[in-house]
Each structure stands twice: as C-alpha cells, then as structure tokens.
A protein has these predicted regions:
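Mixed-charge, low-complexity intrinsically disordered regions
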Residues: 1-78, 84-146
Length: 146
C-alpha cells in the first residue's frame, strides 16, 4: 500500500488528520523496525538532534501523525506522536530504551547500537558525536491499522 492510500484509508476514520502526509522510514533495519511498530513492540524512537538544524528540519510535534514506511517505501502503519523531548545521549533512560523495542530492550543495548549510528551519521555531516550530544526522543502510538 502506498503512503497516500494508507493515509486516505485512515482519513475516513479520522478526518481531522488533514491532507499533509509525513512519511518516513527508520535509518537502519527499516523492515525490522517498521514491523516492531506494527506489532506494538516499538513505541519510541530517537534521532540525532544536530541533524535537524543542519538539514533545516523542524523537530517532530506531539499530536501529529506519521506514516511508517518499509524498505520498499510501502506504508506499514500510521502512528500518532505522543511525546517529544530533547536530552543528552548519556541521559536517555532505560524506560525509553525499552520502549524502542530493539534487541534485548536494555539501555546497554540501546546505547551500543545508537552510539554507533549517531556517530556515523554525525561524522558524515561533519559533526562530532559525544556522550553529551543531544538526541530527539519521540514516543508514539500506532493508530492504523488497529
């Protein structure tokens, strides 16, 4: 299903979502992470704060809806952003790591995987990762399909 087709289907249930679609895929393991969201095991994500300013992109907003894509740019589900915060990487909580639903869901696993990704993405953009680097933490709930 294309993002537009899924958006149109959900709009019949929730007309207040409007016409503007924000569709995206996770930065790594696109299919696995999209499937975790679809199954309700992944209800949070994190991204490197420095990349938002560099790309002139605004931070995610609570109450908005996003279409989650797979590696083929097909719509997997729609989520509503329920919480957005910014904090240093080294202050991300075990609770947030668990909500991300990846690996063994531990903070140690989360830090290992995300430090590697953030360091690489920031380096590619000419920025440096440190344990104090800010990260954008998002929490969401799957709203479609139910």
């Amino acid at each position: 299903m294309t993002p537009q087709e899924m958006w149109n289907a959900y709009k019949q249930i929730n007309p207040s979502i409007g016409d503007e679609i924000d569709a995206w895929a996770f930065g790594v393991e696109l299919d696995l992470l999209a499937d975790l969201v679809l199954r309700g095991e992944k209800t949070a994500t994190a991204s490197a704060y420095g990349l938002y300013a560099l790309e002139g992109e605004s931070l995610p907003q609570e109450g908005t809806f996003d279409v989650i894509l797979d590696s083929q740019n097909q719509a997997i589900c729609i989520v509503e952003i329920t919480r957005v915060s910014v904090q240093p990487f080294n202050q991300v909580s075990a609770d947030h790591a668990y909500k991300e639903g990846e690996g063994d869901k531990s903070l140690a696993y989360w830090r290992q995987v995300h430090e590697a990704c953030f360091a690489e993405w920031l380096r590619e953009s000419g920025l440096t990762f440190t344990p104090n680097s800010k990260v954008v933490l998002e929490e969401f709930r799957k709203v479609y399909p139910l």
